[in-house]
C-alpha cells in the first residue's frame, strides 16, 4: 500500500472541514495506514507545505507517496501548483472534498461522504490520468492550472464576497436568501463592464460590455461527447439587475446560453485577453484584481482513486 502525505484544510466550508479531518485521521490510525500530515492555516500554506515535502523527498521515495488533499478546490489547486512549480516529480493526487463546491470531485466520481471517498482512495492500486487546464498568463509570465473553473469579473467578485461573508447564520437557516443577497451585492460592486477579446482557432471575437467571463473544465463530464472541445467559455454582457436575475434563475432551472446577452463556446485551446483590472479567481482561490492575457491548453495529471471500488449506494451517501 502507498504511503500518504496528507494536507488538510480544517477551515474549509466555514470550518466544518475540521470534523471531517478528525474522522479521516481516526480511520487512518485505526487501520494502520502509513501517513504523515500537515494542516493549513492561511492561503498559500498548502503550496508551501508540498514544496517543502518534495524538497526533502529522496528519489527512491518518488513512487512511494500519494498526496492526499482534504479541503476544497482551492486547497487542491494550491497543492497542484506547488508540485508543478517544484518540478521534481508529479506525485499522484488523492482528493477528499470537504467544501460546498464539489463539482470537480463529482466529475471524478469521488463520493461526497469523506469516509467513503477515503475507501475509494485506499482501494486504488494505480494512478488514473485526468485532464486539467494549464494557463499561461503573459502579463506576469505566470503558469497556472485549474481543475474546475477560472472566473473574471462579477462571478469572481461573488466568490470573493462569499469567502468573507459575515451572515453565516443566514446561510445555514435560509440559504436561498443569503445567495440572493450575495448576488445583489456582487452585482452592484461590479458596476462597470469591461472589454474581452477571444481567439479561438484563427477567429477573433470582441466583446465591449463583458460582465462575467467564465472558463470551465468539462473534460470529466460523463455525458460529454465532444471530447476534442473540453474547455467551456461563457461571457455574459452587462445588463440591468432584472435581466441579470433572470440569468441567475435560468442557470438553475434552464439553459442560460439561449439568452441574447450570454455568449458560449467550447474549444480545445484558447487565448483570451482582458486589458483592465478585474477581480479574478481560480478554483475558489482569490487572485484579486488583475489584468488577464491567458493562453489555455489541456494537460494530464495522475490521480489516485478507484471510483468504482464502492457501490453506487455508498457513492451517493452524504
Tell where the protein language model's regions lie, with residue ranges:
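ATP/NTP phosphate-donor binding region
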Residues: 1-67, 77, 312, 318
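Short helix-capping segments at alpha-helix termini
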Residues: 29-32, 85-91
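Structural motif
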Residues: 38, 69-70, 94-96
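Short Gly/Thr/Asp-enriched flexible loops that form oxyanion-binding sites at enzyme active sites
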Residues: 75-88
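Catalytic core of DAGKc-family lipid kinases
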Residues: 87-209
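ATP/nucleoside-binding phosphotransfer catalytic cores, i.e., glycine-rich phosphate-binding loops
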Residues: 200-202, 225-318
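Glycine-rich phosphate/pyrophosphate-binding beta-alpha loops
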Residues: 212-224
Amino acid at each position: 500500500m502507498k504511503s500518504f502525505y496528507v494536507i488538510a484544510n480544517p477551515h474549509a466550508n466555514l470550518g466544518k472541514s475540521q470534523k471531517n479531518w478528525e474522522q479521516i485521521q481516526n480511520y487512518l490510525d485505526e487501520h494502520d495506514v502509513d501517513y504523515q500530515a500537515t494542516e493549513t492555516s492561511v492561503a498559500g500554506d498548502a503550496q508551501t507545505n508540498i514544496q517543502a515535502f518534495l524538497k526533502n523527498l529522496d528519489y527512491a521515495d518518488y513512487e512511494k507517496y500519494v498526496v492526499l488533499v482534504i479541503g476544497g478546490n482551492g486547497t487542491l489547486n494550491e497543492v497542484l501548483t506547488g508540485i508543478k512549480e517544484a518540478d521534481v516529480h508529479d506525485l499522484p493526487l488523492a482528493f477528499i472534498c470537504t467544501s460546498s463546491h464539489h463539482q470537480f470531485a463529482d466529475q471524478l466520481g469521488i463520493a461526497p461522504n469523506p469516509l467513503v471517498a477515503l475507501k475509494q482512495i485506499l482501494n486504488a492500486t494505480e494512478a488514473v490520468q485526468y485532464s486539467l487546464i494549464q494557463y499561461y498568463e503573459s502579463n506576469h509570465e505566470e503558469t497556472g492550472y485549474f481543475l474546475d473553473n477560472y472566473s473574471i469579473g462579477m462571478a469572481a467578485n461573488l466568490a470573493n464576497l462569499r469567502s468573507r461573508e459575515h451572515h453565516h447564520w443566514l446561510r445555514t437557516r435560509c440559504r436561498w436568501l443569503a445567495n440572493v443577497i450575495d448576488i445583489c451585492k456582487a452585482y452592484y460592486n461590479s458596476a462597470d463592464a469591461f472589454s474581452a477579446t477571444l481567439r479561438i482557432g484563427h477567429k477573433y471575437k470582441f466583446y465591449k460590455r463583458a460582465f462575467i467571463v467564465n472558463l470551465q473544465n468539462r473534460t470529466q463530464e460523463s455525458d460529454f461527447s465532444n471530447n476534442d472541445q473540453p474547455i467551456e467559455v461563457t461571457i455574459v454582457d452587462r445588463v440591468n439587475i432584472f435581466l441579470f436575475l433572470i440569468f441567475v434563475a435560468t442557470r438553475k432551472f434552464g439553459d442560460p446560453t439561449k439568452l441574447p446577452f450570454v455568449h458560449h463556446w467550447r474549444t480545445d485551446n484558447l487565448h483570451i485577453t482582458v486589458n483592465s483590472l478585474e477581480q479574478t479567481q481560480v478554483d475558489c482561490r482569490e487572485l484579486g484584481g488583475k489584468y488577464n492575457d491567458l493562453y489555455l491548453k489541456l494537460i494530464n495529471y495522475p490521480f489516485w482513486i478507484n471510483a468504482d471500488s464502492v457501490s453506487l449506494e455508498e457513492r451517493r451517501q452524504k
